[in-house]
Amino acid sequence: MATPYVTDESGKYIAATQRPDGSWRKPRRVRDGYVPQEEVPVYENKFVKFFKSKPELPPGVCVETPPQTQTQPSDAAGLSRTAKRNMKRKEKRRQQGQETKSEPELQPEPELQPEPEPQGLSQQMQQLELSASQGPGAADSARRLKNLRKKLRQVEELQQRVLSGELKPSQEQLDKLGRAQALREELQQLEAHS
């Protein structure tokens, strides 16, 4: 965007402009030789200047558009060797896939095998159901026993600390001590069942 300069008898000015919010900027006096920041050319080192001055096409090539040949070679020109090989492999697979689709193969029908006896299957299913019902229940009761023993051990430790005067029990701890008998009974019941 070029800055609008106004020149009158007292010198050169940047004209007053309106801001986006509607307020006005004051006109500013500009000294002779001042170049606004937007119009200052960007610094370019030698390397950048060299490549900008260098022609894009090799010498002897016409600037007019060259006649286009097949699209695949132009695509492959920028690819590495492995990429080219991969493209060839994909093309071969496509061609082979098209050939197999065009020539449907006749596959022999699988021979029917005699079905197993239904009684054997029902017996196997019953055994599976029995083992499944015993498995998780046994593990569940073992886990429950372990947890009850742990809770009972914690209650006994708490009781010893209270009796020795080391700890003044809170309401929650007193409730825990009151549940000790119920924990012992539940532990005895589980041990009797397992």
Curated annotation (Swiss-Prot):
<comment type="subunit">
    <text>Interacts (via N-terminus) with magoh and rbm8a; the interaction is direct. Associates (eIF2A-like region) with the 40S ribosomal subunit and the 48S preinitiation complex.</text>
</comment>
<dbReference type="GO" id="GO:0043022">
    <property type="term" value="F:ribosome binding"/>
</dbReference>
<keyword id="KW-0963">Cytoplasm</keyword>
<feature type="coiled-coil region">
    <location>
        <begin position="137"/>
        <end position="192"/>
    </location>
</feature>
<dbReference type="Pfam" id="PF09282">
    <property type="entry name" value="Mago-bind"/>
</dbReference>
<dbReference type="GO" id="GO:0005730">
    <property type="term" value="C:nucleolus"/>
</dbReference>
<comment type="similarity">
    <text>Belongs to the pym family.</text>
</comment>
<dbReference type="GO" id="GO:1903259">
    <property type="term" value="P:exon-exon junction complex disassembly"/>
</dbReference>
<dbReference type="GO" id="GO:0045727">
    <property type="term" value="P:positive regulation of translation"/>
</dbReference>
<feature type="compositionally biased region" description="Basic and acidic residues">
    <location>
        <begin position="94"/>
        <end position="104"/>
    </location>
</feature>
<keyword id="KW-0539">Nucleus</keyword>
<dbReference type="InterPro" id="IPR036348">
    <property type="entry name" value="WIBG_N_sf"/>
</dbReference>
<protein>
    <recommendedName>
        <fullName>Partner of Y14 and mago</fullName>
    </recommendedName>
</protein>
<dbReference type="GO" id="GO:0005654">
    <property type="term" value="C:nucleoplasm"/>
</dbReference>
<dbReference type="InterPro" id="IPR015362">
    <property type="entry name" value="WIBG_mago-bd"/>
</dbReference>
<keyword id="KW-0810">Translation regulation</keyword>
<feature type="compositionally biased region" description="Basic residues">
    <location>
        <begin position="82"/>
        <end position="93"/>
    </location>
</feature>
<feature type="region of interest" description="Disordered">
    <location>
        <begin position="54"/>
        <end position="140"/>
    </location>
</feature>
<comment type="function">
    <text>Key regulator of the exon junction complex (EJC), a multiprotein complex that associates immediately upstream of the exon-exon junction on mRNAs and serves as a positional landmark for the intron exon structure of genes and directs post-transcriptional processes in the cytoplasm such as mRNA export, nonsense-mediated mRNA decay (NMD) or translation. Acts as an EJC disassembly factor, allowing translation-dependent EJC removal and recycling by disrupting mature EJC from spliced mRNAs.</text>
</comment>
<feature type="compositionally biased region" description="Polar residues">
    <location>
        <begin position="120"/>
        <end position="134"/>
    </location>
</feature>
<dbReference type="GO" id="GO:0035145">
    <property type="term" value="C:exon-exon junction complex"/>
</dbReference>
<feature type="region of interest" description="Disordered">
    <location>
        <begin position="1"/>
        <end position="33"/>
    </location>
</feature>
<dbReference type="InterPro" id="IPR039333">
    <property type="entry name" value="PYM1"/>
</dbReference>
<dbReference type="GO" id="GO:0005737">
    <property type="term" value="C:cytoplasm"/>
</dbReference>
<dbReference type="GO" id="GO:0003723">
    <property type="term" value="F:RNA binding"/>
</dbReference>
<keyword id="KW-0866">Nonsense-mediated mRNA decay</keyword>
<keyword id="KW-0175">Coiled coil</keyword>
<dbReference type="GO" id="GO:0000184">
    <property type="term" value="P:nuclear-transcribed mRNA catabolic process, nonsense-mediated decay"/>
</dbReference>
